[in-house]
Amino acid sequence: MLQQWLRQSPRAARVLRGSCCRGPQSGSLRHSPLPTAPHRCIRSLQTSATESKERIPLRKQLKQDAKALKAQKRQKRASEEASRTKWELTVGIEIHAQLNTETKLFSRASTSNTDTPNSNVALFDLAFPGSQPEFQATALLPALRAAIALNCDIQPVSRFDRKHYFYQDQPAGYQITQYYEPFAKNGYVDLFPHDGIAPEDGDHVRIGIKQIQLEQDTAKSQEYPPSTQLLDFNRVSHPLIEIIAMPQIHNPATAAACVRKIQAVLQSCSAVTTGMELGGLRADVNVSIRRRDEAPGTHQYGGIGGLGQRTEIKNLSSFKAVEDAVIAEKNRQIAVLESGGVIEGETRGWTIGSTETRKLRGKEGEVDYRYMPDPDLPPLIIGHDLISNLRDSLPTPPDQLIEMLAGTEYGLSIEDAKPLIELDDGARLEYYQDVVDILRDLQQDKDAKSRGGLARMAGNWVLHELGGLCTKADLAWDAQRVPAETLAQIIDQLQRKRITGATAKQVLAMVFDGDRRPVPQLLEEENLLLRPLSRDEYLALAEAAIGQNPQMVEQIRAKNQLGKLGWFVGQMMRMGEKGRVEAQKADEILRELILGKSDQP
């Protein structure tokens, strides 16, 4: 009897697995009689009232967790606000970006990063005795595009210097850079709320760029614990630009936004091919702290004085790492100063997922690097004609594109305009503009009011509907998968009320999967053209949906929770014949029945 009951009650069986209810051990009797009196373990199977009260429903637990999380965030914001009031954070950024070139900076070796390790190296890359640097002029063009896009003054004459240090990834014992006379100076980058700056920074932050200099990259190191380290010299002498931003940033979020914006600018002008996500761009941040109620600090950086002692955090490889590392170093410095300690000028490291930075080495200064002019390289002379031609050929800057897309011509939200610009190296934006142009031609017979929202509708279909299909199928963007003309025709049919929104999505999916029939033919052959329901049919569907959930109807009436009408619209579309229920008309009928509001004359 007990065994039969246990088979039907797995939960009870779990409770019975106690020390007093174990199966017979080796050597014990195989047929032990059941106890005649109620056994203590069996009595424990009864669910007590106390146990029932302690059990918290999942929904209630989720609400409690959400409240606790909000409380933690409020406490964190309050702590950060108190910290900002007492301490001033200053951040400077140095960005190293690999240029979009086919050859290295001082040799004709390829810059391909997919070839066999140590296969793309020249004698000079490995510092063979007697080898000489040969400046590759093609590396200058993407560097100039970057400097112009970042609003820099291009210097007519610049020179190369040697930065001396000994490390395994630098075979020559020095790096060729432009420390004293860089090719570009005095630029800036503008940051706005849509770039992700901190709310307390207002609507606009301008970060100065002290200089941009050409320099060599180092070898790529790969560690294999416990003691093996391999070097790939394919990366040695890959052309880099180092962008030195002024220490004018006072918030970790704004620091990350600055790096993100500079990467977007570099990609928009084809100065680089990859960003942080693939290792083509790395950032170092300089962090300093000082008390607001004390005299200005005694240190200066980038021509700005009154700062605290700075530390440098090297080789940050993501935007989140930039923000998190600045927060961690800020907190560390505040803790040191509040305990009476002194901040040491040093180089520190950061590990993703960590909560604190770690010391790498004492900070080296200008004297330690022993900068000197490179005697093997002549001055770099840049003509005004070259600068003018490059300036005229640059694409429209991202900020101007956002302003255009969010303006009256297209009317997109900032949230939709940004990804259109940033996705697929501009291919998504070009496709979107083609769709809008074709759609406007198709809708020429409509009045201006009807055509006013076409660009916004096209943006939604390009970004969310078509983009969602690409994401779901894990496919890269391909404008030919759904030609711009085809998508414009689908939206045109939807605008003319010949198909419903659900049918439009169905047709888009069919074309995405390879159906190449013209849209009108596809709609006709698949019987997808809208056959409108009568008012009586809408009323019947609405009454059936309302009957499914009268409690929600009362909530809508009592608390004016109009958002819940969408649930009833969905029910009507599920109950009705596929492709015949129009969401707008269904909503109108529901409002009439539930709220007593009628749009009928």
Swiss-Prot record:
GO terms for cellular component: glutamyl-tRNA(Gln) amidotransferase complex; mitochondrion. InterPro entries: Asn/Gln-tRNA_amidoTrfase_suB/E (IPR017959), Asn/Gln-tRNA_Trfase_suB/E_cat (IPR006075), Asn/Gln_amidotransferase (IPR018027), Asn/Gln_tRNA_amidoTrase-B-like (IPR003789), GatB (IPR004413), GatB_Yqey_C_2 (IPR023168), Gln_synth/guanido_kin_cat_dom (IPR014746). It is found in: Mitochondrion. It is an enzyme of class 6 (ligase). Its EC number is 6.3.5.-. Belongs to the GatB/GatE family. GatB subfamily. Subunit of the heterotrimeric GatCAB amidotransferase (AdT) complex, composed of A, B and C subunits. HAMAP family: GatB. This is Glutamyl-tRNA(Gln) amidotransferase subunit B, mitochondrial. The lineage of its organism: Eukaryota, Fungi, Dikarya, Ascomycota, Pezizomycotina.
